[in-house]
Structure formats: structure tokens, C-alpha cells
């Protein structure tokens, strides 16, 4: 075969309009994936932030609940202690009042018993004697002993100095009242008239003094006695009062039992 002509031809297929409009997936995949990643990052940040917020809120609520519980517990404890203290104080007051009432009841019983004994002893031992046995004169005396002391009531009226001499002539002295109990006892047994006792005003000392110049446990408000009314003391059923020493009244002499000769 001699020279032959080789003819080349190029075949070109034209794409249809539909195929031309199709976009390769690879061409759109990059932008979509980038947008999705950005959106996913934002949501993760929000979720983490919400989680932290919820955790902090839970912690705050827990702390608040604990504080409220502790406050309630402390308040209840304080109320209980206050109530307990109040109950203890009330019980102490009740016990104290019961003890005071018991003591007062005992004192009342003792006073009633003492009063009965005093009246019984006075009615039993009061005797009228002829004072010639004691003074060598015709004075009448009531006498009795009670406790550690004997009492002589010289019924013939005398001045305070006369009573002092009458008592001394019988180896006695005008009565010194030792305390409030003795005063109350004597007011039960003295005659209806007032009686001289051994208390007088000492012009040198400018004060009232007992006949033995010794103090007494009897508390006297001597400031109420006006010396102008008299400087000698009288005993009646109701009170001690001062009077004119030159007036005449019954005498009360006294002597302790341990002072009598054996």
C-alpha cells in the first residue's frame, strides 16, 4: 500500500444543559462543613456555660439550704435551752417557796407551842407570896421563873428609885430585858398597870442605859422618847414608854437562875 492518508477526527460531546447545571458535591462540601463546625463550637460553649451556671446554682442552693438548716437548728436549740432554763428557774422558785412555806409553818407551830407553854407556865407558877420572906417588909410580890430567869413583880407602887431599892434589898435588880422575845413574853404576863423596869436616861452619857450599864440585844428606837416626858422606862402590855421617875408604879425585878447562890 502506497502512501495512505490518515485522517484524524476529534469527537466532542456537548453536555446537556441539565448536566451543565449539576454541581459537583466536592465543590460545596468545604463551606458547609466549615459552617457546621462553627455552629457546633458555639453550642458546645453554650452547653458548657449552662453546665457551669447550673453547677454554681446548685452549689449556692445547697449552701443556702445548709445555712437555713443550721439556723433552724441553732434557733431550736436556743429555744430549748431558754425553755429549759425557764423551767429550771421556775422549779427553783417553787422549791424555794415550798421551803420558805415549810419553815414558816414550823416557826408558826413553834411559836404557838411556845405561847401555850408560856401561858401554862405562867398560870401554873404564878404565886402570891409574903415578901417578908425576902425584904422584911409587907410588900406583895408575884414571882415566877421562866427559862434562865426569875421575875418578881412588886405590887406595892413605888417611884423608880424606890423600886430599885426594893429589888436590891432582895438581892435582885430592876429588870433588864435582854431581847425582843423576852419583851413579847413579858407583855403577856405583866399586870394591867404599867411597871418600872431597869432602863433610865444617863445624863452623863446623854443616852439611855440599862441598870447594869451593859448593852442589850433588844433594839430600841430611843430617839422617839422625849426626855422631857421622863427619864425612866415603863413596861405595859402594849409598849415600852418613858415616864417621870417620881411617879409611882409597880416594880419588876429580875435575876438569872445562874446568878442565884447554890
From Swiss-Prot:
GO terms for cellular component: external side of plasma membrane; plasma membrane. It is a single-pass type II membrane protein. Disulfide bonds join 145-150, 163-251, 167-253, 232-245. It comes from the Eukaryota. PANTHER family: KILLER CELL LECTIN-LIKE RECEPTOR 2, KILLER CELL LECTIN-LIKE RECEPTOR 4-RELATED. Homodimer; disulfide-linked. PROSITE patterns: C_TYPE_LECTIN_2. The chain crosses the membrane at residues 45-66. This is T-cell surface glycoprotein YE1/48. The gene is Klra1. It is found in: Membrane. Keywords: Cell adhesion, Disulfide bond, Glycoprotein, Lectin, Membrane, Receptor, Signal-anchor, Transmembrane, Transmembrane helix. Receptor on natural killer (NK) cells for H-2d alleles. Inhibits the activity of NK cells thus preventing cell lysis.
